[in-house]
Amino acid sequence: MESLYNNILHFMEEYFPAYSRYAQDKETQHLMDRFYAPDLTFDEGVVTSREQWYERCLTHPDIQDKLTVEHLFIDERQKKAGALLKTQAVDRATGEVLLELKMNVLYNLKIGDKDIKIARVRVFLEGDPDKVKKLAQLYAIAP
């Protein structure tokens, strides 16, 4: 019998490459349903559903986000996982990395008998003001 820790680890190890590959393409977003709860929330209600998150993922069609895990931790008792990630904004046409930054992300998980889903996401971005400014420009994020 697999431990809950190992199940969460396997789930998270599958999640990051799936996000990078499928979440930002309307044709493949549905593949992410296996990772996200329908009532997914981000950062204190900035996103309040899986569908709203999918819409947000499509707002930068010329840029592909690529996530690389640098460190992953799991707290099976609290049903949480956290990751130190390197994220790259990659120009889809040229493959050029337009921006690279670090972020810490905390994931609250819903754990059922047969599946695990991400229920809440909290993102803490690198504090470099130049990178934050470029991020806002690339993704047309209002100040």
Residue ranges and their predicted role:
Residues 26-81:
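A solvent-exposed, acidic/Ser-Thr-rich amphipathic alpha-helical stretch
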Residues 20-23, 41, 112:
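Residues in soluble alpha-helical coiled-coils and helical-bundle/repeat scaffolds
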Residues 60-143:
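A beta-strand edge to alpha-helix "cap/lid" segment located at domain peripheries
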Residues 12-19, 36, 57, 83-87, ...:
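Hydrophobic alpha-helical core bundles mediating ligand binding, dimerization, or RNAP-core interactions
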